[in-house]
Amino acid sequence: MFEPVPDLNLEASVELGEVNIDQTTPMIKENSGFISRSRRLFAHRSKDDERKLALRFFLQRLYFLDHREIHYLFRCVDAVKDVTITKKNNIIVAPYIALLTIASKGCKLTETMIEAFFPELYNEHSKKFKFNSQVSIIQEKLGYQFGNYHVYDFEPYYSTVALAIRDEHSSGIFNIRQESYLVSSLSEITYRFYLINLKSDLVQWSASTGAVINQMVNTVLITVYEKLQLVIENDSQFTCSLAVESKLPIKLLKDRNELFTKFINELKKTSSFKISKRDKDTLLKYFT
């Protein structure tokens, strides 16, 4: 009754590679829970549980924190488990508490660092959930000292760099004593470089404080990093005339070059890591 259609009478040969299921292993912390692609969704019994799960999700990116520091941040989140901070988006509270706690220990993140390690916070475009708005809300709810996160104080940003290149044998949480000279030197260079830009009227006043700080810190970091790679390659030295009171610890930078490179590479992956050629050329004049 029915005649076969020649064009649809096709044959296909599909070859599958050999797969031995017995040899496959699950990923660490892998579970069968459902994670929505449109929003972060955690199975939880309470808001406290949800915050802790969220904190674990975010802190794994801060690879340079040791177990004591991570435990300390969890205890800080646990201390406010009965506080209702936001009616919605409770998950996002945990990383903000972590950032404010780390800031209280003298370490802050520039906009590029925030994008590298907390892209969800950086890419939030809602006015209600923008970074500065959330910082203000959490400071008010938890009784933290009120103030802007980004201020013209460069030491805290370089303290985060110091955390990332710490020696494995450092003692105490957020301890950067061995790297303190590097923090002082980079900060002095940035302060003097910032004043040079002010005198030359090169600072973009329409930009936010965070954007200006981000540009200054990124320029200094990439310039020092590239000079360091040259001296390692040529087995030479370099100095910066802007570092008057605290000379750059070249030996320390050479010893920690692998860690420094890893940190810089994380920053380079971000969209906000943009260096002005004019600023970089101006800064290079002070390096010999």
UniProtKB/Swiss-Prot annotation:
It holds the Pfam family Pox_A8. Induction: Expressed in the early phase of the viral replicative cycle. InterPro entries: Pox_A8 (IPR006834). GO terms for biological process: DNA-templated viral transcription. It comes from the Viruses. Belongs to the orthopoxvirus OPG134 family. Heterodimer of a 45 kDa (A23R) and a 32 kDa (A8R) subunit to form the virus intermediate transcription factor (VITF)-3. This is Intermediate transcription factor 3 small subunit. It comes from Vaccinia virus (strain Western Reserve). The lineage of its organism: Viruses, Varidnaviria, Bamfordvirae, Nucleocytoviricota, Pokkesviricetes.
